[in-house]
Amino acid sequence: MQDLKGKVAVITGGAEGIGKAIAVAAAAEGMKLVLADIDADKLNNTVEELAGTGADVIGLRTDVSSESSVQALADAAFERFGNVHLLINNAGVALAKSAWETTQKDWEWVMGVNLYGVTNGLRAFIPRMLEKGEEGHIVNTASIAGLLSEPALAAYNVSKFGVVTLSEGLHHDLTLRKAKINVSVLCPGWVKTRIAEAERHREADQRTDFTKIDKVSVMTGMSIMKAVQNGIEPQQVASDVINAVKSNKFYILTHPHTKAGIQIRMEDILQERAPTLLPI
């Protein structure tokens, strides 16, 4: 989808971080925008900021883990603009715990946002996009943790591996139907966002009590937080996404050096050996 001008983009997690950066980049291409986020205040600020630059943009507070909330987002998008050409399933959360420390509520929260948030988006938008019959593109945000298993990120890893294989299967399903909709899966490494603070959106009694987490998980979590703080700017990721949409690129790897780790993982599998623990 090389010409984005006048096309409509829906972006979840669009109030800040990678989502906001993609929104800014899409607006610069002349796209109309529908932004969704759980944080209504930040969402309103971003919508006002973009509207101030001349962008045609609306925002809707959305809980992507809720099917009805995402369906309402789709209703609003199609009612306002008549079609959707670019769907960015981007909303995501994370927490640092080993598999045995991750509670059932933790699993439900992470999977609800990171994986079911994507499946809800696909169900709400794809049938209508197919019915319109126009050229389109879907970008699902996974992570390098969807290709490489990081320590102390049990639920996050599972959710992001899920997004990768979901996206691969989606590509096959749309190809078999000769649909005009292409797919990309975004697998960024460390990016300077607030994802390490994602638990701020949880109920207080469900947030991680770090006094009850073992020191290995705590130290690993601190290393991850530092890596995020030293990560690349979201604007670089947004540029990669726009370029991938225009060139119909499936895998979006924002950090080229991670390819070496992916190669090691493939070799581990082919050699049937234990997974190599890569540096954070």
Each model region followed by its residue ranges:
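Conserved glycine-rich Rossmann-like NAD(P)H-binding loop of the short-chain dehydrogenase/reductase
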Residues: 29-46
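Residue(s) in the substrate-gating loop at a strand-loop-helix junction
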Residues: 143
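The beta1-alpha1 cofactor-binding region of Rossmann-like NAD(H)/NADP(H)-dependent oxidoreductases
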Residues: 40-41, 60-72, 104
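Substrate-binding pocket helix/loop in short-chain dehydrogenase/reductase
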Residues: 98-99, 103-108
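Canonical Rossmann dinucleotide-binding motif of NAD(H)/NADP(H)-dependent dehydrogenases/reductases
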Residues: 2-34
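Active-site helix of classical SDR
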Residues: 122, 159
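SDR active-site lid
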Residues: 176-251
